[in-house]
Amino acid sequence: MFMGEYNHIIDAKGRIIVPSKFRDSLGEHFVVTVGLDGCLFVYPNEEWQHFVEQLKNLPGNKEARQLQRYFMAGAADCEVDKQGRILIPGNLRQHAGLDKDIVFVGVLSKIEIWSKERWESNSYDNMDEIADHMSEFGLSF
């Protein structure tokens, strides 16, 4: 399970150091794809295969095909180099607006990669709103 928030910098070649707490759980090879809300999703291979199976089992309608294209066209196989970095392809950097400061966010079975600016604008500052969402989904402490 992935959790936590880690700030890093992306270099001029599009490489980012993966937080050490995430490296073991990611494994040697994993998938980076377009995410929702302007971020990237990073899946360990096992989780990615599970997600792909769900995409395969969608009906053949237009909406399902759009979802399949969205996630599969943006997907890239990645691996961590000897310095603990991953190379984010240009199209994915552009999708997420990654240019310098980035944030890794652990979200259960996947990792999200955000530009720091987008992350800060999407973060919840309103605790009442969070409490309302928790109640709406039946969550309690």
Curated annotation (Swiss-Prot):
What GO biological process terms are annotated to this protein in UniProt? negative regulation of DNA-templated transcription initiation
One CC-aspect GO term: nucleoid
Q: Which residues form the SpoVT-AbrB domain?
A: 5-47, 75-118
Q: Provide a Gene Ontology MF annotation, just one.
A: DNA-binding transcription factor activity
Where it sits in the cell: the answer is: Cytoplasm, Nucleoid
Q: What is its main location?
A: cytoplasm
Q: Which UniProt keywords apply?
A: Cytoplasm, DNA-binding, Repeat, Transcription, Transcription regulation
Keyword Repeat applies: yes
Q: Does the keyword Protein biosynthesis apply?
A: no
Family annotation (InterPro entries): MraZ (IPR003444), MraZ_C (IPR035644), MraZ_dom (IPR020603), MraZ_N (IPR035642), MraZ_sf (IPR038619), SpoVT-AbrB_dom (IPR007159), SpoVT-AbrB_sf (IPR037914)
NCBIfam families reported for this sequence: division/cell wall cluster transcriptional repressor MraZ
| Entry-linked PANTHER family | TRANSCRIPTIONAL REGULATOR MRAZ
- State the family named in the UniProt similarity comment for this chain: Belongs to the MraZ family.
Q: Can you state the subunit structure given in the record?
A: Forms oligomers.
What is the name of this protein? Transcriptional regulator MraZ
Species the sequence originates in: Lachnoclostridium phytofermentans (strain ATCC 700394 / DSM 18823 / ISDg)
What is the primary gene name for this protein? mraZ
